[in-house]
Amino acid sequence: AYRPVANDRLNALASYTWLYDMPGADQVNVDGNVNGPKQRSHILNAALSYDLNQQFTLGAKYGFRLREEAARGTNTFITSTAHLAILRLDYHIVHNWDILAEGRAMAYPKADTTEFGALLGVYRDLNDNVRLGAGYSWGGVSDDLRSLERDREGLFVNLIGKF
């Protein structure tokens, strides 16, 4: 993480996840499915945000997933990759209120497929550590590379804690 105290105009965060989701009989996978597939995944993420001025913040995220997936009850794994790109703009309206717009693209090179999505939301800072938001998501592209399912489109409510 790069989050300077003296000048936090630019913030960066990178992460690596090793997901070993090999549920046995009657156990759920990461998506909560009893009969869903099992997976082994390496996931890399990098996110940046930059304050253009006091009202606008530009954000970007890139994610990469290398996954091995098999149907429940088999050990025949299929390897695939995915690339996630997100571009986001936050607008600080007035004290404690923000609007955000986000565009998303998820590319699956092996399948020669790219999916697109968008998100609009309104957020309210309840205090220094809690933010509540609501909005609408189009296109079904999730920012969670652990998931094996498409994200659902529609309304969402989001509660964020920051420390």
How would you label these PLM feature ranges?
Residues 1-163:
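Gram-negative and organellar
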